Design a protein with these regions (language model features):
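Conserved donor-binding loop and adjoining core beta-sheet/short helix segment
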Residues: 6-8, 21-124, 236-238, 244-267, ...
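Active-site/acyl-donor-binding loops of N-acyltransferases
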Residues: 135-154, 231, 285-337, 341-350
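Short amphipathic alpha-helix that is part of the acyltransferase structural core
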Residues: 1-46, 164-214, 338-339, 344-350
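Conserved beta-strand-loop-alpha-helix junction that forms the acyl-donor binding cleft
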Residues: 91-92, 119-128, 267-271, 296-309, ...
């Protein structure tokens, strides 16, 4: 087996990785939103926030360019320089050694880039989770993915929720924009990104520090690069004119029946006014006109984030699939563990 660096500009290699992605999703995630070739190409190149990253794929020996699996390794360059985030995708049970060898290779690449900890996810109760624990990973927290089926939502449901929330939000007004962040809001969006540091995460993870330049260079550039239709709804504090809350959602034009929830944040001084529910309900009202073909919206929440879960459930989100486990794996532990010499890593996606 050959493990080769993925060139995201090489259409044939990206297509080979996409075929792996599709096969894995059909086996493990048949209810979830489909990924598109264009989205995967952009993701392999720069991930979600344009952090440095690299991707590698496993091919058969010889000249056969059928991929059996691939991984994506994110290497943050502003905070958490000791960490790397890893995603591995392999075909359903082609050969247990594929996932094992990709994991070992990813550990070697992480170490070569000065990283000492891998952060990764696995389905709770899956063979992958069991394998990662046997390789030395420790559980950090769990999260579940939820979906909102707009086809079954009662008429007027989101409007009623928005109006009910607005009664607790005197002194705030709603604004919207599509596409990249307007220049005048860059600083406020950065402040709300910093408010996301309150969300559950691994112990020892450093706060992300956002400013206007980072919003433009990392978030907005990702919107443009991936070619998604991006929507933002914000609550403005009337007395100061500052943004107090923000929710964002994206629609892939190649898969327009699904919406993908981005960040939802309420700045600390403005919490307690139901602004989270207000902006999210307003978003869904807006999309009924802006994206009439939209059928479902997906989101994910850490189990500990009870407040956001309660908002999503009020909107109508329901569990889409079992909980996922976030794990932390020291690179040295991974590479020194003899369990990697055994054919025990089941195929699938994480």
């Amino acid at each position: 087996m050959r493990i080769l660096r993925v060139d995201p500009s090489d259409a044939a290699t990206v297509r080979a990785c996409y075929e792996v992605q599709t096969a894995a999703a059909q086996a493990e995630d048949p209810l979830g939103p489909p990924k598109t070739v264009r989205f995967l190409r952009a993701f392999l190149a720069e991930g979600f926030e344009a952090n440095p990253c690299e991707s590698w794929a496993a091919f058969s020996a010889g000249t056969d360019m059928t991929a059996h699996g691939w991984y994506w390794l994110e290497l943050p360059d502003r905070e958490n320089l000791d960490r790397a985030t890893l995603i591995i995708v392999v075909r359903p049970r082609p050969d247990h050694a594929v996932g094992r060898d990709l994991l070992r290779h990813a550990g070697q690449r992480a170490r070569a880039n000065g990283r000492t900890i891998l952060s990764l996810m696995a389905r709770q109760g899956s063979p992958l989770e069991a394998f990662l624990h046997s390789a030395g990973a420790r559980h950090v927290y769990t999260e579940a993915r939820r979906a909102l089926d707009l086809r079954t939502a009662a008429p007027g449901h989101f409007t009623a929720l928005r109006e009910a929330a607005a009664r607790h939000a005197a002194g705030y007004s709603l604004i919207t924009w599509s596409g990249v962040t307007p220049e005048r809001h860059l600083g406020d969006v950065a402040r709300l990104e910093n408010a996301m540091n309150d969300a559950p995460r691994e112990a020892g993870v450093e706060d992300s520090v956002w400013d206007a330049d980072r919003v433009r260079e990392r978030h907005d550039s990702s919107v443009l690069r991936m070619g998604v239709r991006a929507y933002s709804v914000a609550a403005v504090h009337d007395a100061t004119g500052e943004l107090a809350a923000l929710t964002q959602l994206e629609v892939d034009p190649d898969s327009p029946e699904w919406g993908h929830q981005g960040m939802t944040a309420v700045d600390r001084p403005h919490r307690g006014h139901r602004l989270g529910l207000l902006v999210k309900a307003a978003m869904l009202d807006w999309l009924a006109d802006a994206e009439p073909q939209l059928e479902q919206v997906e989101t994910g929440n850490a189990d500990a984030n009870e407040h956001m879960i309660s908002i999503n459930e009020a909107l109508g989100f329901r569990i889409l699939d079992p909980s996922w486990t976030w794990l932390e794996l020291p690179v040295t532990t991974l590479l020194d563990n003899t369990v990697l010499d055994k054919d025990v890593l089941a195929a699938g996606e994480h």
